[in-house]
Structures are given as structure tokens and as C-alpha cells.
């Protein structure tokens, strides 16, 4: 308001100055509009006393409006002011002269006999062609002679230096001829006047318009804004802070966190004090929370959020609900930040909120399910070859769903393909240190979310399904139809040094997952049939090999054996041994390594091809060390087929040696881990020794 008053005062001062300038210009113009007279004085007799003769004089005067404006000519003759009061006819003068009258100060002549207009008329009656008034001592005579009086003789007013020069000629009793002429007015004088008046009028118009606008412009009443602010504050939500209840709801995963409760220690952004139980909190439309006594005074003055400057009076932008969030922000699940998915088509305003997972006790299972381009499930055997071609390009997305406490639940982060193991956490250490790290990071059930690139690309298994490749409704960990007990992850651990290599067992049909392998039961060391012994052998190249043998009790033989070709079980004594032998010899039976390894689509490794040449090419179908290990099966083979007995005995000893070689690996990993093929374990053991 003070600023408006200052502007109004400035405009009023400008208007006053403009009006004064216009008035002065108009007065000057009026004076200039008075007709000027040129008085030419020509002496009749020159002085012969030796002085310098005076020449002609040209003086300027002003025609008075009391008489007509016309030129005149005559001899110069002086009259006293009092002589013009006498109307007697005693003083006779020749007509045709020009009278000059020097006026005295008004103090001396307080009561003049006649007015100046009457004196000029009287001089004209006496024969004067014109009257000259010297008004040097009486400047008021100019105003007296401005009123027209109908005098026929011109009246000229003269003052200043020009009047002194003319009186000097009279005082020396010199005769002179005076000629009065009318001076021509300049033609551009009227144009200048109109230009000045136009500019002055324009300035005055704008000044008046600005003043009227300031007077008509009224600020909005402060009461209406205050009422709107109070109404908006009354509509805002409040809640009572309860810290214990908040912790319970966070633990159960049933609390939707806001911007202030997402921190471990929620504080008020205004007073910077922590929220305590029982305090009233004000919830703004932007999901920010403050103390009721801290934010209400701020809202009454500014009606905006202190953090995000959201205007609570802004009706154009609707307040964002709690369930919405900006599309560029990631929605995190409550306990596992790695399990995330992007939300879209949400309002852009507000603060992100965190939603808990429906079941925080489950990890995403690392089952070998895959999605093709048509979003259909495929078996790992079908996707193995496809994933190998894109293995090197997809190395940057191998790791998802890792908890922040231990990024790799199976042990350590894998190295890139072709890099040395010293770049990883082991830094060139032995297999024991890597195994210790692997065992140190296990959480309950061994769940591995990392499938590193292996040293042998042909022996690599397809990586586990990333959580972002699965549809939302098809996530096994979030599907309520799946059994929670069956959702577990197997431990698959690889290392660049090829120190140890674990593979899944032969896939078994399970009700929870068709590609999960059953775990082998851990044999108690207190069992009398369980013992270990150390053996020292010398290899073909002269190197010493130290093996530790673990004897386990053989399970009781069932009456059926598993056929790897048909994936079915059949009774052992349906036919005699010679018939079985003929069937085996006539069919294209895979080798022992293929039977032991199970159904695999990966090509055999280089170490396996070397061992394959020394293994027997044909074995009885009924002998499968992985599925059925009866002691009497070998004896029956010896009695019926001696040739088979020798081969089976060699293979049985070879399998036992493979089992013995795995004893060193059990020192570093407990028996509950999934075991790999015996040939691959032997190759790894050779490399380690």
C-alpha cells in the first residue's frame, strides 16, 4: 500500500510540473503574440562642435492593444505627463508629429488626472500621429494599455536601453525624424505552439490514466485468502504417532510407509525432533508429515509444504493419494530391495512410498524356468543352447534379488569370463579360503542368486531366471498356489580356478517343481557303518595323491530298478539275465558316464572325453549305481555272465574310487549340498591336487 501511495505522489508531482510548464509556455506565447514595432530615428542636424556625429537609430517597441496597430511617421516631440492633463487650446502645435511621454513612478502621481488611454487620445486630438510611452519607471502601464479603447493613433510602449537612447536624443534638443513600422511575425510560431500543446496534452492524459488505474485497482481482500487457508488446513488429515505399532506393522509387512515413516528414525523436518508416541501429526496431500504445532503456523502464512513447496490451495493439481507415485521411481518391496519392479501411469507429483512384499519369508526360487519371445515356459534343456549364444552379452544382468547385507547369498561375487580369480574376493587364495567365504555367507537354506560365467563355456548351465523376466502373476515366491515348503533354491557354486564344481543331481519329479532334485540324506558320523580312512596313491606321472575314503551303508535294495531310458521303474526278476543281456547288446545303450550323469543336454567336457575312452562301452542296464545299489546284483552277474562280472567289478571299483575322491570335497562343503557327476569331481580333484 505504501508503494502505491508513493507512485501516486510521483505521478501527481509530474502532472503539476507539466501543467506549470504549459502555463508558462502559453504566457510566453501570448507575450510573443503582441505585435512588435520597429522605431527608426533619423537626426535632422548633425553636431558641428567636433564630436562624433550620431547616426540613425533602430529601436524596438511594442504596440499597445488600446489603439490600432498601424505604421506612423513624423517629427519627434516630447510631452510632459501633466501637459496632457490640460485641455486648453493655448498651446498650438503643428500636426504630424510623434509625441513621446516619459511616465514617472506611481508613487509620485498617486492621483493622476487622466488615465493613460485618455492621455493618448488627447495627444491624438492635438495632432500627434502616434504616441510613444517610456514605461521604464512604471511597468504597470503595460497592463493598463492592453484593453482596447478605440483610439485611431497607434500607441507604442518602449522601455530599457532603447528608451534611454531615444530620451538622449530628446534631452539634447535635437530634431529627428521618427518612423514607426510594424514588424512581421514568423510563420512557424503557431506551429510550435500547437506541437507544445499536443505533447503537454499527451503527457497529461497518460498521467491521469495511471492515477485512475491506481485508484481503481484494489488488492484482493486478505480475509478471503486467510479463510481459504484455514479451510484447507481443516480438511487435512491427522494421525497419532505410535512407534511400537509401527514396528509391529513393519515386521508383519502390513503397513504402507509414507515419506516420513520410511526412515528408521522419523523426524519432523521443521523442528528436527523425532516423533514420539502420542504426538499429533499433520499429513499433507504430498504425503509429508510434520508436528501439528510446527506445520500449522507455517501453513497459515505460506500455505505450502516446507519440503516440496506443494500448495494446499492449488485446486488445479489434485493431491496425490498414498497409493500413487511418480512413474520414474522404483517401487521397492519391504525387506528385500533387490526384488523390485517399475510402476507406470502414475501422477508425477509427490513422494515415493515403499510397499512391503506379501510374503517376506520367501526368496524368489531359482528354478530353471525360462521365457521365450512368446512368453511361454520352456524347459532348461530347450533353452540351454539359446542361452549360451547370449551368455557374453547378458553378463551385466546376471545378478538380481540380492540382499544388501550379503550381496551373494551363496558366497562371493563371481568374476567376469576370462578374468583371474584374484580379482574376486579370494584374491588368488586357495580353495579353502573361497569355501570359507562361501560357507560364511549362507543364510539358512542355501539359496544362490548368482550364476557366474564358467571357465568352460560348453559345461555351463543356463543362468537362473531373473526376477524381472517373470510376469508379476507368475512369480513363484508371490504365487499363493505354490507350496512355501517346496520353494527353495539349490546351491550352485562355480569358481574360476576350477577347484570345485557342483552340479544338480538327476532331476526328479516333485510336486512343487518338476526340475528340483532331491537332497541326499546326511549320514551321521556316529553310525558304526560310517567311517573314513586316508589313502596315499601315486599317479602315473609320479605325483602323490592323498585321498580320504568315506564308507556309507548301502541302502536296502528294492525290488524295482529305475530305467534311465524310459524314466520308469520295472521289476528286476521279470526276465532272466541272458534275455536282459541280449536286449542290452542289441540296443544303443549310452555309456556309464551318461547313465551316471542323468539327462543332460550339455556336451561332455574335455576331461570327461578323456575318461570316457577308458570306461567300458557296454554295461548291463540293471546296474545303475545312482538308482539301485544291491550287493547281490554283482554276484548274480558273476554267476551268469563272467565277462560282465569282470567289467562290472572294474566299474564298481571305479565308482567307489570316485566316491572316495569326493571325501576331500566334503571337508569344505557339508553333505547336504547337491553333488555333481563323479567324473567331473574326479577331474576337479586331480586339478586341485
Swiss-Prot record:
Record topological domains on the Extracellular side: 28-191
Cellular compartments annotated: Cell membrane; Endoplasmic reticulum membrane; Nucleus envelope
GO cellular component, one term: plasma membrane
Residues carrying a glycan: 56, 86
Positions annotated as zinc finger (RING-type): 268-308
Enzyme class, spelled out: transferase
Keyword ATP-binding: no
GO molecular function per UniProt: transferase activity; zinc ion binding
Full protein name: E3 ubiquitin-protein ligase RNF43
